[in-house]
Design a protein with these regions (language model features):
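Macromolecular interaction modules
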Residues: 1-256
Length: 256
């Protein structure tokens, strides 16, 4: 069907989002704003600007999660980095961007998104990396996601070294179609795309390698999710809860 037409996009065209909930919002209010406004608006207001894939996950309210771990994560693929930056010439994109302040802590870039660089063995805090240097389609593929906290027995520098070693092993030994990671001083976020060719019912994964260097962690399997509405339809919104994870499905713009 047209909504799942495969399009390969470069791994450096993804924005890696780590969002922290506004303290004034309760968990129910946070999830409500994500489900009624933010997640659907990301899709409906960004398709015409060149959005290629959008995979959000909700961590707020998960048992054991510490405040230094993001409350929401997402990867947003674009046709290219240039396409993303050109989007700000559009009123719809500028309007959508303003909605962040009603949901997330934006001061001092606590909540932020960044483009990745190719992983070459070392990590820097808040600089995402991609492990597989070839294009892939993350909307039509099977995605796994893990978010984890730094062990309390480690300082941030040691944590960074341990995670870099784990990512190096994944890059060298695990046959994936894509892998993206970002480390903060207190957390790691990581996504991987399973091989597209049919084969084993248990595709290769790097998740256990990373889980061994994490303290608290949670694995997500984003569910393919369609939005059967337009911007001007009457609609109550999505059901977003703590632990929700979506691989949003949509028809890309025609010239993508």
């Amino acid at each position: 069907m047209s909504e799942r037409k495969s399009t390969l996009v470069r791994p450096d065209s993804v924005r890696v989002w780590r969002g922290f909930r506004l303290p004034a919002l309760t968990l129910d209010q946070f999830c409500s704003k994500l489900g009624t406004v933010f997640v659907p608006a990301t899709v409906k207001m960004q398709i015409a600007a060149g959005l290629e894939a959008y995979i959000p996950s909700i961590l707020a309210g998960l048992p054991g999660k510490v405040d230094s771990v993001p409350d929401e994560t997402a990867i947003l693929f674009w046709e290219s980095q240039e396409t993303y930056w050109n989007g700000f010439t559009r009123l719809a994109v500028r309007t959508y961007t303003l909605t962040h302040g009603g949901v997330y802590v934006t001061e001092n870039q606590k909540s932020r998104a960044d483009f990745p660089v190719l992983f070459a063995g070392a990590l820097s805090f808040d600089q995402p990396v991609y492990l597989i240097d070839r294009p892939a389609d993350w909307m039509c593929g099977v995605v796994s996601h893990v978010v984890g906290a730094r062990p309390t027995s480690q300082d941030p520098a040691t944590f960074c070294t341990e995670v870099a070693g784990a990512l190096g092993r994944i890059q060298k030994k695990v046959a994936l179609d894509g892998a993206i990671a970002c480390i903060g001083s207190d957390y790691l976020v990581y996504w991987e795309l399973a091989p597209s060719a049919p084969g084993s019912p248990h595709p290769p994964t790097g998740l256990p390698i990373l889980q061994r260097v994490l303290d608290w962690n949670r694995v997500f399997m984003p569910a393919p999710t369609f939005l059967p509405i337009g911007l001007w339809d009457e609609w109550a919104g999505m059901d977003v809860q703590s632990g929700s994870s979506f691989n949003m499905q949509f028809k890309r713009r025609e010239n993508s």
